[in-house]
Amino acid sequence: MDIIPEKRVELEKIDINYATARRISLLGGEPFFDPKTFVILEKLIEHNNTDCFISIVTNGSIALPKSKLDLLSKFTDLNICISIDGTGPVFEYMRWPAKWDTLLDNINSFQKITKNISISYTISSLNIFYHQQTIDWFNTQGIRYNHNIVTNPNWLSLDSMPVELKQLLDNNEFAQPWLTITGNEISLDKYKENIYAQDRAKRIDIKDYLPEISNILT
């Protein structure tokens, strides 16, 4: 049974038998920010069900106190899947306001309580330029990953990225399936408009994180 803790869900109304549940998946928002996550885990422990498979999808931004890590460590079949869409400043831009150093510390903490760590990597028209360095880092860390291709919002999809960007990706082997000019590409001006609107809302500047992309926009 998959349990997705959300603010609108009343825990007592969740239909789950804590003594016999074999699988529970805790997804987003951010499970480690939601107190219900740990209430569920504590109830499983109370029912001596620490063999239940626990899957948690996190953005890796929250440093857990030792008490929470100790609680997680009681489960013998624990998978933690971390959403990582780049390294260093690329990660910080894609997952703002998360910090890269905090993520690294959290990965280290997770690896002390389970060997089953994986990465979910979402690829868009922004981070495709950093694809090789991203997967090189995954491989260096020895962490399994799966990738997802953005289709929505349209302006971030690989199919619809501006022609000017597609032309700069000629040497990017991974990007080749999306480089054909179809006529569905958005204009570079529209692309810039969306990026700048996003940056204003976050009070950040893309040039501080993705200078290669910023140079294309100027």
What are the residue ranges of the model-derived segments?
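Conserved C-terminal portion of the radical SAM core fold
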Residues: S55, T76-C81, W100-L217
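A generic secondary-structure signal
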Residues: E12-I14, I40-H47, D70-L71, N106-I113, ...
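Core AdoMet radical
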Residues: M1-V9, Y18-P35, H47-P65, S73-L104, ...
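Exposed alpha-helical structural elements
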Residues: E10-K13, S67, V90, S187-K190, ...
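Distinct, well-ordered alpha-helical segments
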Residues: F38-E42, P65-L72, Y130-Q132
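Glutamate identity and glutamate-enriched acidic tracts
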Residues: E6, E10-E12, E30, E42, ...
